[in-house]
Amino acid sequence: YVFGSSFGFILGSSSLLFSALISGGFGPWLPFQMIAIGLVGFGAGALPQIRTPRLLLIPYAVLASFTFGALMTMWNWPYLAGLGSSVSFVPGAGVAENLIRFIRFEIATGGLIWDLGRAVTTSALIGVTATTLLATLKRAANRAVVEKLTNRN
């Protein structure tokens, strides 16, 4: 939010990469996590700067939590649901039909419950810490010296 879209995407993606390096959390899900959380950071950086940022950041946190959860479920949904069930991905079917199947899969696996927990926790933390944290980040942004890279040939 404070440092912009590009920084948000890079920070989100790289933080998951370094987290995986430290914790050994490498797997086929890592690139999807990096892209999904990078998009969350990108979206936060694209939000307009307003006088009361909590009013904007809390709804964004709810939307981003459910979007992140859906993106993370999408990467493995065709494999976990199998073939031929009412929740499985059907190649060649329309978007609406597969979307209905995906929503059924999310409900059946409890994915929406995890997303709801993520949304509530994130919103509560933003509600409690936003004022102090944003003031600190804005102060750091004002004190930082950042220059654009240019080709000096």
What is each model feature region?
Residues 12-48, 53:
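Interfacial aromatic-anchored transmembrane helix boundaries in multi-pass membrane proteins
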Residues 26-31, 46-152:
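Membrane-embedded alpha-helical hairpins and interfacial helices in multi-pass inner-membrane proteins
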